[in-house]
């Protein structure tokens, strides 16, 4: 079964420095139908204005992934990390026993567009960690493993049984992903247009897959997608 979550159906929020769309219930937006999907809890589609950002704030027991689509994001945290994340780069932070961080747009004029993702960990009280992985030079027509429980194939090790893939497609590109029994998929279209198992999707759309044996993607334009393969 495939259930489509259209971009325009998400929860919108707007502030002086931030325009965002919530795929799942978050902050003041609540929808009992969309409290998360398996261990996936948050997908926020954020556009932060020049000079804007999230001031220092704490987290505990959450796996936090940021994927930058355009612009740049300056990260600082209580573990001593200070980095500027650019398009095509994945940032990972395990909050574990507790971490504080800030995320700001260092440009005074150019917005930064990103996806902020939260995944529930499989255990509480893990050691806070930080990692990055770049797919800026990755060729289209393939899924790239960004994070996994085992850290296999050079992916970032995370505290949950989920494989997180970054996919890039051009017009006419086809990507296939085989699902093992009792696995689930959430697919989030970050940019562009594509077909998922014959169903049309556009930027901002999401899809929940259960009971499927494979994911078949066909690019209609230059596109990016995040695929979560969950237990």
Predicted segments — roles?
Residues 1-231:
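Jelly-roll (double-stranded beta-helix
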């Amino acid at each position: 079964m495939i259930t489509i979550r259209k971009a325009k159906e998400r929860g919108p929020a707007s502030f002086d420095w931030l325009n965002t769309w919530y795929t799942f219930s978050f902050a003041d937006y609540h929808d009992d139908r969309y409290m998360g999907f398996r261990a996936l809890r948050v997908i926020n589609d954020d556009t932060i204005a020049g000079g804007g950002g999230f001031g220092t704030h704490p987290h505990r027991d959450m796996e936090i992934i940021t994927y930058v689509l355009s612009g740049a994001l300056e990260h600082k945290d209580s573990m001593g990390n200070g980095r500027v994340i650019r398009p095509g780069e994945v940032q990972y932070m395990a909050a574990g026993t507790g971490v504080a961080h800030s995320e700001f747009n260092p440009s005074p004029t150019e917005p930064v567009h990103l996806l902020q993702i939260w995944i529930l960990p499989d255990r509480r009280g893990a050691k806070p960690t930080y990692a990055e992985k770049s797919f800026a030079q990755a060729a289209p027509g393939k899924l790239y493993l960004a994070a996994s429980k085992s850290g296999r194939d050079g992916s970032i090790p995370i505290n949950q049984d989920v494989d997180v893939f970054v996919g890039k497609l051009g017009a006419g590109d086809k990507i296939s992903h085989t699902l093992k029994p009792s696995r689930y998929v959430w697919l989030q279209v970050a940019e562009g247009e594509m077909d998922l198992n014959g169903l049309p999707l556009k930027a901002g759309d999401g899809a929940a897959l259960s009971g499927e044996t494979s994911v078949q993607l066909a690019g209609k334009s230059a596109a990016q997608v995040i695929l979560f393969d969950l237990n």
